[in-house]
Amino acid sequence: MDWKTVQGRSKHEGISFLTITLPDFGKDFERSLDLGQVDRSLFTGFQWKGGLPRFLGGFLDLVFDRASGRLLNKPNVDAVLAIRQLTLMFGKISLPCSDARERKAMLDFIKCEQDVRQSDSERSPIDFEAFCRMSDLLFARMFSRVDREIYYGDIRGKHGPGSTADRLLGNQKYDQQVWTRRLENVFPFGDHIFPSHSYYDLYESVDILEPGMEIPVKVISVPKTLKTPRIIAIEPTAMQFAQQGILRAMLDSLRKDDILPGLIGFDDQEPNQLLARVGSLDGSLATLDLSEASDRVSNQLVRAMLRNHPHLHEAVDAVRSRKAEVRGHGVIRLAKYASMGSALTFPFEAMVFLTLVLMGIERELNQPLCRKDVKHLIGQVRIYGDDIIVPVDTVRSVVGMLEHFGARVNTRKSFWTGRFRESCGKEYFMGEDVSIVRFRKEFPARRKDATQVISLVAFRNQMYYAGYWATCKWLDEELRRILKHYPVVAPSSRVLGRHSFLGYETHKMHATLHSPLVKGYVISARSPQNPLDGPGALLKFFLTKASLNGSSQKMSHLREPDDENHLRRSGRPHAVDIKLRMASPF
């Protein structure tokens, strides 16, 4: 019956049944786990039988009582996992949204800006003072170290591989000729872009933009779900370069702190995931998720955090783009610090949220916190971007504080009542891992659909490790129709193939190395031609091939280039292909 429902509604409603309707069912199921019962306001669009939806009724009966809708005393964890896997699997498939949903996302971006301005105008002096006191308690030492590095000129920028608002790609970024007056006051072009002082005669060719003439960030959408796209902002090359330098200094300084590494993370999600499991096991910890998290962090809050650190304050302001070009709305001035796209968005949003979380805990305890008190909260409080862990007995005060300062808590993805918890891509119920495997790309029709083939092979192998072996058997049959050679390989092999607990295949031995070889398809992705010479090439060598010595970031030794063609080709590949090769199975 369930299979017929999926088949019939998919035929009638199209792919949106799999990508929107079923995921909504899954989210309502998670909400029911948190509430401890099934509410009649949930599961809209599905027929009911008794106190539960008829769809997936066999699984639901193992979790909830059908007569009352209440959670069973001993709910079946396998049934919880099955329902989540079946309903949420296609929720984040990478497909373009409709034009109407794209326009709505851009309009929401504009409305979010208005909300930030409104929140700024309503913030009282008492709020501001409390925020500054907590921020100083947490970050003053860290900021002082970075402030000192900026004063002594120890910051070194870095170019990333992504797109930029001024459309410079790959090696072109090392020949940039545009800077801003605000950057020039903190990070002089000659000191940071010219490889040595002997090139200072080229200064006259540099275009130093005054504040009113700066290039705005370009706001674009990228696939997230079929329901709504993700909104990001593409930064100008100059801003992106300087942001990376400050980011590196901030992360180095944070790691040296005696408290902060235990409360906030930037490159390791596992601590959040482990705490989420604890919360699902004993109910002591809540997991919170924020909507439009980075877009709701006010620039005024960031300025307040840095007010006692003048050099860092000026630098962070200098690398912030003040305007954004929004499709359909023109160029607007930004009230937020920055959207996703700036290298500093992630750390500053996390630091602002940590400050607000501890302010909420302080209010709940009705006493001011000191650093010793904060240290005792390690293992109970953890921030990773907009994924937040807090003690359950402080959650309402924390939520109130976050929303008072302009954040928006996503109640559909925040959990603290029952025994379901979610953080940083892991989900737990009663201490058991009920995380799912997601289908990311459309099904490939032929071998030349390389991106989809690669994604499907990865999906198959994830399903294998999750124990869905019957599904893997069906997927293997489908993949063999697309890939003539589809061997069993180790996870470390670059060959597209099946993973197995039973080892790997060997088709022949290497003639000279006498090591195993297997015939299969490997990923082929070449960076576009992008030749670089002259001072730009020398700058790239100094910036990317220098081993940095601690927080001072001075060169300790120089290494040979990792890619001998890096001065001829650079940037992200325009296309990805798969080619048949003899390669190592491990």
Predicted features by range, described:
Residues 220, 230-232, 242-243, 295-298, ...:
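Short helix/loop capping segments that flank catalytic or ligand/cofactor-binding pockets
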Residues 223-227, 282, 328-332, 431-434:
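Short acidic (Asp/Glu) and glycine-rich catalytic loops that position anionic groups and cofactors
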Residues 265-272, 398, 405, 429:
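Conserved PLP-enzyme active-site core in the AAT-like
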Residues 331, 362-371, 436-442, 458-469, ...:
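Positively charged, low-complexity nucleic-acid-binding target-recognition regions
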